[in-house]
Amino acid sequence: LTVGVVTKPFNFEGRRRMMQAEKGIEELRTRVDSLVIIPNERLKFATDQKITFANAFEIADDVLRQAVQSISDLIKNTGFINLDFADVTAVMQNAGMAHMGVGRAGGKNKAEDAAKMAISSPLLETSINGAKGVLVNVTGSMDIGLEEVEIAANLVQQAAHPDALIIFGAAFDDTLEDEIRVTVIATGFEEVEGAMPNKPFSAAAE
């Protein structure tokens, strides 16, 4: 299994650099099973941190690291309902463009908020709408409620294709305390007509 995770240049880097990146992405698509594309320009929608010229590229590199680590963690970390390499392969092998989102939230509506963040990641150009292959992993402390898990999983299922292969996993992490983390990897949505890039999702303050 070969998964590519790449960034596209900031707009200020110029049209020529963007064209070179687009050409490289098209070539890379023929050499990987799945490809996650993160446009640097969308970083401004995805963080409350002030983005300066000095730290812009550092933030972009950290986003890449988080994307790769999220996939790696699903494979290597043992969960209560475990996801493994075979599950990741089932969704990402020969799958083309991929959506990968992680949401983390606390408070009364934490399950809904975390799931929506994962589904509508402001960093990506892809959309989970109509996805035909989905991995969803819900992580919380030992006292996470069954209803909260159901809410998060159902929101992901509703966004995917009715006949999608959905593989569900769950894990415990007491360091999250009152928070829930939802990780979503989705593929098989390239044929969806009219799919639009995701808009940022903001959870209301509790």
Predicted regions and their residues:
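Tubulin/FtsZ superfamily GTPase core signature
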Residues: 1-206
